[in-house]
Amino acid sequence: MNSKCVLLLLAFTAVLTLTACSGSKNTCTTNCTTSDAIVNVTLFDTPPTGLTVLSYSLPIVGISLTPSTGTPVSIYSPTTIVPTELTRLQAESALIAMDVQVPAGTYTAINVTLATSGGIFINESTTVLNTTCGVGNVCPLAGGAATTVTIPMKLTLNSGQASWIGLDVNLNNAITMPTSTTVAADFTQANTFAATTTPRTGTPSNAFDTIGDFIGTVTALTNSSITVQNTITGQSLTAALNSGTQFDAAPSSYSNCANGGSCIAKGSVVSMDATLTTSSTLTATEIDVLDAAATDEVEGVIYPTGPLTATPVVVGMILADKISTGDNTTLGAVTTTFGTGIFLAANTSINYVIDEKNLTNSITPVGFAGSGDLLAGQQIRAHVTNVTSGTSGISATATNVLLRWSRISGSINSFAGNNFTMTGLPQYIATLNSTLIQPAAVFTYQNGTLFDGVTGTGDPNFAVGKPVAIRALFLNSNAPPFQAAKVRVP
């Protein structure tokens, strides 16, 4: 791919002031009564097809419920804009509101107010799009204008009872092509949002939903709870710790942590998995220590900008997460956010390791030992230095590289035992990774892989042709290339 095209990577950036927002509890503080009901809201994304979107930032600035009589009741109204990155939600859920008290009664619709949004896509067509986006280029996706979307639903909230609303955003349905050479996103299109109140099959008992791979810095820690704050969004989540919470750590050569339970502290950088319980609380199921102490670092999906035999190798990264210790103004800027493009230089002599997370005791993965194992579509995390902004965009030098979890969608092609194969992968993954055997093989692990929407590969709904999304290690190996920590079948 022509690296010059990444000039167009300059991220869509809403003018945001990002401060902590704890999953917006919005708990009632005045005029509250014992007759109030409790509402929780999460957001997830239908596995995408069609246009390959590498990043999409959707700022939700308000949510209300329409009662059968009377005026709408607000259940989410953040004081600052908290953007949600949609592409990761093809396999995950994001917590929007928790433990919100609202009047008991019957409601007929949920209203979602959006600020201006936008993203980054790959032009996999055979023609120039949007005047300047050449074939094979990575380009900005014109976003949807600020709007309010009303989703009809029947909802009865009972006094003292906790309820859950799952918002399913369908980015496919929001993508429009007004002409054969233009593409944009419009969230007023039909069937862009749907709402459900029934937890998906595979959700743990006594839980409404699961929150996966929430990354941030530990801001508070006790024997019974942990608070983690994401750098880009400012969102803070506080979760209970109990005897069932699993502590892991990325390899010590990356994390400087030999054992997750012993080195985690305030200031550590972690990935947290949690359940949103039917008691309207979060319980941490896994804490994966990425860094015992914070250091400048970036994470995102990558693609090659030149040969992997070059010294150093330079890959393009679409930013999905960052940690800034404050010494670098480019990395710390609020404009360095979801979708920002970074040219990442990585020498062959540095450390390349794998974040095995909850599969630590199940596998010894191979296929990520050096710069020659960098593949288009992988999600990597890297300690960085020399982060600078110039005429060609942002560049950085990687000093330590960690393979993390790609979110990839396709269709179930075949299955046998715990394994299955996928077709319909994003075109750039198939095109740019010449060694990838297709249909691509996915390995799942008993008592390791979380299934969402199905109970496992033996579930009747796990069928050939069904859409599927995975959170998986993407290895430069065909035995098999995808090691799945999570599988979602809508």
Annotate the PLM regions.
Residues 22-308, 320, 325, 332, ...:
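A short, solvent-exposed, low-complexity linear motif enriched for acidic/polar residues
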